[in-house]
């Protein structure tokens, strides 16, 4: 009995040895791509959620919290609005003749002079802000028969009563206020901004005390425009001890044109003009501190980097800024489709190619080879296909930034309550633009992601086809991204396949011979190793059963006698 069992064991071992020797005459070569345990989800045209090995965030969602003073010239308005600095409010004298790229208005800014209003406040503010300068040139206006340099206790300049430094308050001289008619030509080659005003007394008595006439009139004209203002006498809410008001107006005089001022009372006259410039200067309301740093893009929240194509920090920007979108995140695929590697590969340690899964741990390339031959297993990257994919993906982010970054500023849109309908329309237009840009951004990123994934898949297929053309009938496609090579292929042979120097003819006869020796039907299942072992065990078991049956039959015939002793 023991002899039979030992013989069965050696017979099965021989079968196993034959199987191993058969494997030594073949090799397996698989092609695969890089994979990571946890990829990044991106959106493409065809799939809202597809996992890739690597992706770059495209939306800047936070600011530095401070405004950088380089490369843009930042002028901190502190407690002065731009209009107060323009008019020459006593507490804003420090801003005379200042220049800026961006004037930062603070929420703590206040007026500290005679109360005024500007009927076209936003236009004047925007005009001066874009000019980028408060450069003022005094001119020699002749005001005959009136008292100049009027002041008010509401506008202290030091201990004495004062007034806006860029304006001249004209009142009666004695008991008369003659009709004033003054002209001032523009003989220069640039536009001149004249700021003037009309005083609205709180009572009729104040009107006659200051200007004699019961009702004044101010007319300012050029060849292109004319404005006539009649004072509106009446009491208003008290501000800094005054219930009267001054309305501020402005006139632009082109080169070769003439400014004409005509008035019989209530005129707040200009002292000169502001030199207008064209440029990209602007104004922004912000309470962010100004710091010494470098940033091309500024928002009211603070400076932000402009190395991303989109941002959702603030709609108001200045400089070369990412485009504002509603989305909090948009990810650009900068890697290939991610298929995490399966950890269990069977009893024989089988390898699989890109059709089944990706390969983790490929640190030197995106695409590569794994092999299994008589010398063991190995892995190497294919640098050529890796570089081809990287070259096409590199620069993708920069191209998106170039398409979307604004090289100009988005100014604030403000309107008075009277212009509420215009404000609503402007808000609707701005919201629509943001919606369109947000949708366009999402579509652009989805298109780029689709292109990246298709590109990386294509490079994998190119490498597979290149390998198949080299091997020809010397190997068989296994269907999982691998080739079964029907000849002995050591590491040098594998290397020749990888670098493209493999000579098909050298191994042709051996491969054809091995094809005939190997069984025609080959198991293709992923559980081939298990099935082979199970079949092997069953065969050995059946052999033992047959031998035992033969022994029992022989015993019954008397050919073999079995004695059992107790």
From Swiss-Prot:
Glycans are attached at residues 23-24, 38, 54, 181, 301, 499. Residues 552-566 are cytoplasmic. A lipid is attached at residues 555, 562, 565 (S-palmitoyl cysteine). Palmitoylated. In natural infection, inactive HA is matured into HA1 and HA2 outside the cell by one or more trypsin-like, arginine-specific endoprotease secreted by the bronchial epithelial cells. One identified protease that may be involved in this process is secreted in lungs by club cells. The chain crosses the membrane at residues 531-551. Residues 1-16 form the signal peptide. It is a single-pass type I membrane protein. The record marks 345-346 as: Cleavage. Its main location: virion. It is found in: Virion membrane; Host apical cell membrane. The keyword Metal-binding does not apply. One of its GO terms (molecular function) is host cell surface receptor binding. Keywords: Clathrin- and caveolin-independent endocytosis of virus by host, Clathrin-mediated endocytosis of virus by host, Disulfide bond, Fusion of virus membrane with host endosomal membrane, Fusion of virus membrane with host membrane, Glycoprotein, Hemagglutinin, Host cell membrane, Host membrane, Host-virus interaction, Lipoprotein, Membrane, Palmitate, Signal, Transmembrane, Transmembrane helix, Viral attachment to host cell, Viral envelope protein, Viral penetration into host cytoplasm, Virion, Virus endocytosis by host, Virus entry into host cell. Disulfide bonds join 30-482, 68-293, 80-92, 113-155, 297-321, 489-493. InterPro entries: Capsid_hemagglutn (IPR008980), Hemagglutn_HA1_a/b_dom_sf (IPR013828), Hemagglutn_influenz_A (IPR000149), Hemagglutn_influenz_A/B (IPR001364). One of its GO terms (cellular component) is host cell plasma membrane. HAMAP family: INFV_HEMA (MF_04072). Belongs to the influenza viruses hemagglutinin family. Major glycoprotein, comprises over 80% of the envelope proteins present in virus particle. Homotrimer of disulfide-linked HA1-HA2. This is Hemagglutinin.
């Amino acid at each position: 009995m023991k002899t039979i069992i030992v013989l069965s064991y050696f017979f099965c071992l021989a079968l196993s040895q034959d199987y191993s020797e058969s494997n030594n005459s073949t090799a397996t070569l698989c092609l695969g791509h890089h994979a990571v345990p946890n990829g990044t989800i991106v959106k493409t045209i065809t799939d809202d959620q597809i996992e890739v090995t690597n992706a770059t965030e495209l939306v800047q969602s936070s600011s530095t919290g401070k405004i950088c003073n380089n490369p843009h010239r930042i002028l901190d308005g502190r407690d002065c609005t731009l209009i107060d600095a323009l008019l020459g409010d006593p507490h804003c004298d420090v801003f005379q003749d200042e220049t800026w790229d961006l004037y930062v208005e603070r929420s703590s800014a206040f007026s500290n002079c005679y109360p005024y209003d500007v009927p076209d406040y936003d236009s004047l503010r925007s005009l001066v802000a874009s000019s980028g300068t408060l450069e003022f040139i005094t001119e020699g206006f002749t005001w005959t028969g009136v008292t100049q340099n009027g002041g008010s206790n509401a506008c202290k300049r030091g201990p004495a009563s004062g007034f806006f430094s860029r304006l001249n308050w004209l009142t009666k001289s004695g008991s008369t206020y003659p009709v004033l008619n003054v002209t001032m030509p523009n003989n220069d080659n640039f536009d001149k901004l004249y700021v003037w005003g009309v005083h609205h007394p709180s009572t009729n008595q104040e009107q006659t005390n200051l200007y004699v006439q019961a009702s004044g009139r101010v007319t300012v004209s050029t060849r292109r425009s004319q404005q006539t203002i009649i004072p509106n006498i009446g009491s208003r809410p008290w501000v800094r001890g005054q219930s009267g008001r001054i309305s501020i107006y402005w006139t632009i005089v082109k080169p070769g044109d003439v400014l004409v001022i005509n008035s019989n009372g209530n005129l707040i006259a200009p002292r000169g003009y502001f030199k207008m410039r064209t440029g990209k200067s602007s104004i922004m309301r912000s309470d962010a501190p100004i710091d010494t740093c470098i940033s091309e893009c500024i928002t009211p929240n603070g400076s932000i980097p402009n190395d991303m194509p989109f941002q959702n920090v603030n709609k108001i920007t200045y400089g070369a800024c990412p485009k504002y979108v509603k989305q909090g995140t948009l990810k650009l695929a900068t890697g290939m489709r991610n298929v995490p590697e399966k950890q269990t590969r069977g009893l024989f340690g089988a390898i699989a190619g890109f059709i089944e899964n990706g390969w983790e741990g490929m640190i030197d390339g995106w695409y590569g080879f794994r092999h299994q031959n008589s010398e063991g297993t190995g892995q190497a990257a294919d640098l050529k296909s890796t570089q081809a994919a990287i070259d096409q993906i590199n620069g993708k982010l920069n191209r998106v930034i170039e398409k979307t970054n604004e090289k100009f500023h988005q100014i604030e849109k403000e309107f008075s309550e009277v212009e509420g309908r215009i404000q609503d329309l402007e808000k609707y237009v701005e919201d629509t633009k943001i919606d369109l840009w947000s949708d366009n951004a999402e579509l652009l990123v989805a298109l780029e992601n689709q292109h990246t994934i298709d590109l990386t898949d294509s490079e994998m297929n190119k490498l597979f086809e290149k390998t198949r053309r080299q091997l020809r009938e010397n190997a068989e496609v296994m269907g999982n991204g691998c080739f079964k090579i029907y000849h002995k292929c050591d590491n040098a042979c594998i290397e020749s396949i990888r670098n493209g120097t493999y000579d098909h003819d050298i191994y042709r006869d051996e491969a054809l011979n091995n094809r005939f020796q190997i069984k025609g039907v080959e198991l293709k299942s992923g559980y081939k190793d298990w099935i082979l072992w199970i079949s092997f065990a069953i065969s050995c078991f059946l052999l033992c059963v047959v031998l035992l049956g033969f022994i029992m039959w022989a015993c019954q015939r008397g050919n073999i006698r079995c004695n059992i002793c107790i």
